[in-house]
Amino acid sequence: MVVVGIVGASGYTGGELLRLLARHPEVEEVRYATSRRLEGKPVWKVHPNLRRDYPDLEFSDPDPVEIGEDCDVVFTAVPHTAAMELVPDLLEGGAVVIDLSADFRFDDVDVYEEWYGVEHAAPELNDEAVYGLPELHRDEIRRTDLIANPGCYPTGAILAAAPLVEEGLVDVVIFDSKSGTSGAGAKPSEVTHHPECAEDLTPYNPTDHRHLPEIRQELGKLGDVEVHFTPHLAPLVRGIETTAHGLGDVEIEPKELRELYVEYYDGEPFIRVCEVGEAPRLWAVRGTNYCDVGVFAVGDGRVVVASAIDNLTKGASGQAIQNMNVRFGFEETAGLEEPGYHP
């Protein structure tokens, strides 16, 4: 069993980590839930759904080295550019670190610095980090102490297109993604304020979203492919629906395409391939670590694949716990087996 710390526990991803860890069979204790702003406040005051699970746990702000010394694994759920200041001390303390920010996701530090506009504070650790998408990097995850949890959009996009790219069926993939507002975090803004977005559907950063180089990096490891990506803010709380348009010299029947996906993801506990012509539904994955994938072959050198994930679970905290399970040799599904909600 493991002792866990969460650095940055007051936001949505921190709350989702707490929710999923509360009944994890291999978690002895969540010892730290940190927040400088809320130090001393009961965790359940911010996450009232967890009142019975954490009646005595309070937000704290200890030294990162101390957290690393006291915990077997630490999740960093802090903003981009903040994690790289903390991770070296957490590792020095002896903990395995699973970072939910973008700070260690890129193989090339220069790419990170270009897209995030800051100089990397711990480039010496970048080569040690493993991109934490278990479906592609399970063996490497088992051997590292620094796991870079993928972004929410890249998770849905990469899982939708990986079989197409690795099999060399397409030359170009165009991703169109719709996300719920929880992906923007707990701090409200004019764009994510409910009256502004409840009856709207808005593309943003249509050609230069920060998740684009992340998708390109991972799919580029599978094959030679050109990647484009446009996200949209949808009037939802949770969920990301991604449609991948694959273009190339490809003619394939829907049944054959589905069989390719079933074989590619055979044995993957959190990938569910829909029936031919069946579209994945967001409500079917809400609150779960599943990624549902639907395949459509339309002819004329084009195939369409859609994926659905919960951006806070498989797109963030659930995947982070999946990575913990893999790293520590637990059952990969431990703490993550609850079905979705309907309706």
Swiss-Prot record:
SMART domains in UniProt: Semialdhyde_dh
Pfam families the UniProt entry points to: Semialdhyde_dh, Semialdhyde_dhC_1
GO molecular function: N-acetyl-gamma-glutamyl-phosphate reductase activity; NAD binding; NADP+ binding
CDD domains: AGPR_1_C (cd23934), AGPR_1_N (cd17895)
Biological process terms in GO annotation: L-arginine biosynthetic process
UniProt-listed Enzyme Commission number(s): 1.2.1.38
Xref: InterPro entries: AGPR_AS, AGPR_type-1, NAD(P)-bd_dom_sf, NAGSA_dehydrogenase, Semialdehyde_DH_NAD-bd
Leading EC class: oxidoreductase
UniProt-annotated location(s): Cytoplasm
Pathway connected to this protein: Amino-acid biosynthesis; L-arginine biosynthesis; N(2)-acetyl-L-ornithine from L-glutamate: step 3/4
Active site: C152
Keywords linked to the UniProt accession: Amino-acid biosynthesis, Arginine biosynthesis, Cytoplasm, NADP, Oxidoreductase
Keyword Oxidoreductase tagged: yes
Gene3D superfamilies: Dihydrodipicolinate Reductase, domain 2 (3.30.360.10), NAD(P)-binding Rossmann-like Domain (3.40.50.720)
Superkingdom, natural source: Archaea
Catalysed transformations (reactions): N-acetyl-L-glutamate 5-semialdehyde + phosphate + NADP(+) = N-acetyl-L-glutamyl 5-phosphate + NADPH + H(+)
Gene Ontology cellular-component terms listed: cytoplasm
Role of this protein: Catalyzes the NADPH-dependent reduction of N-acetyl-5-glutamyl phosphate to yield N-acetyl-L-glutamate 5-semialdehyde.
Family, per entry: Belongs to the NAGSA dehydrogenase family. Type 1 subfamily.
Protein known as: N-acetyl-gamma-glutamyl-phosphate reductase
Species whose genome carries this gene: Methanopyrus kandleri (strain AV19 / DSM 6324 / JCM 9639 / NBRC 100938)
Species classification: Archaea, Methanobacteriati, Methanobacteriota, Methanomada group, Methanopyri
